[in-house]
Amino acid sequence: MDLTLVLSLLFLSCFHGVSSDSRYFTSLFTLGDSYIDVGNFVIMAARAVPAVPVWHDKLPYGMTFFGHPTGRLSDGRVIVDFIAEQFGLPLLQASLLNSSDVSKGANFAVGGATAIDVDFYERNNLVQFKLLNNSLSVQLGWLEELKPSFCNATKGCRGCFSKALFFVGEFGVNDYNFLWSAGKTEEEVMSYVPKIVEHIVRPWRGLSTKVQYMWLCQGIHQTGARQPF
């Protein structure tokens, strides 16, 4: 089992028995890639010009829990659904649905999301196709845009995130995928590691000193033994 999934489950076990009126978390915000995307990729792909092919908008995706496709790259739920259920929160909708009710949080994750902005890969000819603009910085921008609506829904900005849990899914795996697919050697890929890590870490440095809330950050899984590599 993926170590990051194990750690996430251990985190949930610490709050076993917490009721829906818990003092712990009253909202959940998630950023990440396909592991926790609940429909943003499908929405972005449909809006893209030309449209981006989508394969997970039909069965068997969604069949084991929802009974129909939901935009999740899973036949059922994803890890953030279980986290929401643990705290008595509703399953988050994709943020790009622009729901009028954001009082319980939002899911900003998009399949294929990168740590480094996508124009870096396009500008340096590291990909042969147009990428969706879904990087970590873009998702953080969406979060910033949503903040006034969330704070209004929770009666004021001062401390409005104090009972929010932020789940940051894996970032970086798609960056490495693009580099390997571009024919980069192991040494060349390794040379990009500091840049990728810096893009993942940098946004949180300022936030952690300005706002009080809890972050749960997921690392990337080992890729060396996976079939594409």
Region spans (language model):
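Conserved active-site regions of diverse hydrolases
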Residues: 2-229
